[in-house]
């Protein structure tokens, strides 16, 4: 056994902990199907949101961890529930009123409001796949519509008809009395209107593989359960899909957790072993509300990628999946800088430490070196004091700090400068509020200015930080009040960088001029 595999078998990183649970399923015999199957499900009722991406990213991390501890082949399936009826019209699509007449039709039978695909479901599936492809995920996409219509689900549907009473008994226990009267695990699709019907069954004929029911307008109908004429209610569908595909691992949000025993029982009734599952906490927007596909709150994948790299988003997804996290624009700079801190740490770590480092899981063990010369938060401060409209303005500061660097030989730094200018103009600039210095703060700022004016030492972060400390230590206890003053008076922000590093990048004499402008009240007019 290699050193890496040995370390992986005891690693406390959560993807390895999950991978070991999956491996335990096959400690006696390998899977009959010849591979271990990881699955993620996607409900394409609205535009794909960042939580959807997170599920695939995290599942991929578990699959990659499994590959490190086992030689059994793996597959990752992304399954889209696009045969679901459209229950309500999403608010974040063009011409929503035009979709009203298509309520209750499968999403793949609803016209695409964007006018680019054969259906709304196809549009949203394409959006999801584009996002996943951007991140280089290796996955197989399965459409529920295709899965049902091409007969791939037929064997399980016929088994569900044969086990109808058993599955119904599981479901009825979970329903309120009034719902029990009309509930059926089978949802017929009206042959003419195309609508998914929620009607009780008059007969389920397992031998013939048919169901008989009265349609919503009172007409008695008999349909085969096979070939896409009928779909399963979503809870039975969950367990049935596990059985049909032989799923070994699936993760889903906390909102599904109470249904897990139902999914498991149905999978067993249909003759298969349920998968290992992992429940993650939900993402919240800045107001603490759950991010939802249909309302479009929170940060979209495209929005994150407007302001930061794909790796920073993967880093955010790795962190504490069982803790509810607010996901809004303010978290982006922290995610970028922490990701690069972990990259820099990785080079000096031993095997066990590397396997516990988030970047191992983000990059699947093939971890690059960080070439982020200047932290993202520092770039934002430089953009702030220079009112940067273009990344070339930031490169002037970057090259002062690292003369050998340029956009051509450091494309990652170039991209970060571009992201920082965008982020500054969209989020920092509108919120900038400068304030005047108090008498004590003015005295300290004048002292700092005078010491910087007279400074003829090296442009070194630590040397300059010592001057900043000295000016504050004589006057402020705790020292935090001094740094808060620097940020609020000079940068118009509530927090900021290590100030010595800021001076080194921005320039000593430029910082002197900035202090003079602040003390003269010139920055207050920007408010």
UniProtKB/Swiss-Prot annotation:
The keyword ATP-binding applies. Gene3D superfamilies: 1.10.10.350, HUPs. The keyword Aminoacyl-tRNA synthetase applies. It holds the Pfam family tRNA-synt_1f. GO terms for molecular function: ATP binding; lysine-tRNA ligase activity; tRNA binding. Its EC number is 6.1.1.6. GO terms for biological process: lysyl-tRNA aminoacylation. A motif ('KMSKS' region) lies at residues 290-294. Its main location: cytoplasm. ATP binds at residue 293. PROSITE patterns: AA_TRNA_LIGASE_I. Keywords: Aminoacyl-tRNA synthetase, ATP-binding, Cytoplasm, Ligase, Nucleotide-binding, Protein biosynthesis. GO terms for cellular component: cytoplasm. A motif ('HIGH' region) lies at residues 44-52. It catalyses: tRNA(Lys) + L-lysine + ATP = L-lysyl-tRNA(Lys) + AMP + diphosphate. Belongs to the class-I aminoacyl-tRNA synthetase family. HAMAP family: Lys_tRNA_synth_class1 (MF_00177). This is Lysine--tRNA ligase. The lineage of its organism: Bacteria, Pseudomonadati, Pseudomonadota, Alphaproteobacteria, Rhodobacterales.
């Amino acid at each position: 056994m290699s050193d890496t595999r040995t370390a992986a078998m005891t690693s406390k990183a959560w993807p390895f902990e999950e991978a070991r649970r999956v491996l335990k399923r096959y400690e006696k015999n390998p899977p009959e199907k010849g591979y271990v199957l990881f699955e993620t499900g996607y409900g394409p009722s609205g535009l794909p949101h960042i939580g959807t991406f997170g599920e695939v990213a995290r599942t991929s991390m578990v699959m990659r961890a499994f590959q490190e501890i086992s030689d059994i082949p793996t597959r990752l399936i992304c399954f889209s529930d696009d045969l679901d009826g459209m229950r309500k019209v999403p608010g974040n699509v063009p011409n929503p009123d035009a979709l009203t007449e298509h309520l209750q039709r499968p999403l793949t039978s609803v016209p695409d409001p964007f006018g680019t695909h054969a259906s709304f479901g196809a549009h949203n599936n394409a959006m999801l796949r584009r996002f996943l492809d951007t991140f280089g995920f290796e996955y197989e996409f399965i459409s529920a519509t295709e899965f049902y219509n091409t007969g791939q689900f037929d064997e399980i549907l016929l088994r569900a008809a044969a086990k109808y009473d058993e599955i119904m008994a599981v479901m009825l226990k979970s329903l309120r009395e009034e719902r029990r009267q009309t509930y059926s695990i089978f949802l017929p699709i009206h042959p003419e209107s195309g609508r998914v019907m929620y009607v009780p069954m008059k007969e389920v004929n397992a031998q013939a593989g048919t169901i008989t029911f009265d349609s919503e307008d009172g007409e008695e109908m008999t349909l085969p359960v096979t070939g896409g004429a009928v779909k399963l209610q979503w809870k039975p569908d969950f367990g049935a899909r596990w059985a049909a595909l032989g799923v070994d691992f699936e993760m889903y949000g906390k909102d599904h957790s109470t249904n897990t025993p139902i999914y498991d029982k149905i999978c067993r009734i249909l003759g298969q072993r349920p998968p290992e599952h992992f429940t993650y906490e939900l993402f919240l927007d800045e107001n603490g509300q759950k991010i939802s596909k249909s309302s479009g709150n929170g940060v979209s994948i495209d929005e994150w990628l407007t302001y930061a790299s794909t790796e920073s988003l993967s880093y955010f997804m790795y962190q504490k999946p069982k803790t509810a996290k607010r996901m809004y624009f303010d978290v982006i700079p922290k995610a970028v800088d922490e990701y690069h801190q972990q990259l820099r740490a990785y080079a000096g770590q031993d095997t066990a430490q590397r396997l516990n480092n988030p970047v191992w899981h983000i990059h699947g063990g093939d971890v690059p070196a960080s070439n982020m010369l200047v932290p993202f938060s520092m770039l934002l401060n430089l953009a702030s004091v220079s009112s940067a409209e273009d990344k070339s303005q930031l490169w002037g500061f970057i090259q002062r700090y690292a003369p050998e660097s340029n956009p051509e030989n450091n494309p990652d730094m170039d991209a970060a400068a571009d992201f920082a200018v965008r982020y500054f103009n969209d989020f920092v600039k509108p919120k900038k509020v400068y304030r005047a210095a108090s008498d004590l703060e003015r005295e300290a700022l004048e002292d700092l200015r005078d010491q910087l004016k007279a400074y003829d030492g090296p442009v070194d972060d630590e040397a300059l930080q010592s001057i900043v400390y000295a000016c504050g230590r004589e006057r402020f206890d705790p020292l935090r009040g001094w740094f808060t003053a620097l940020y609020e008076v000079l940068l118009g922000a509530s927090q900021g960088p290590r100030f010595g590093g800021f001076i080194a990048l921005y320039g000593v004499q430029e910082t002197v001029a900035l202090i003079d402008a602040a003390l003269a009240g010139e920055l207050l007019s920007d408010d």
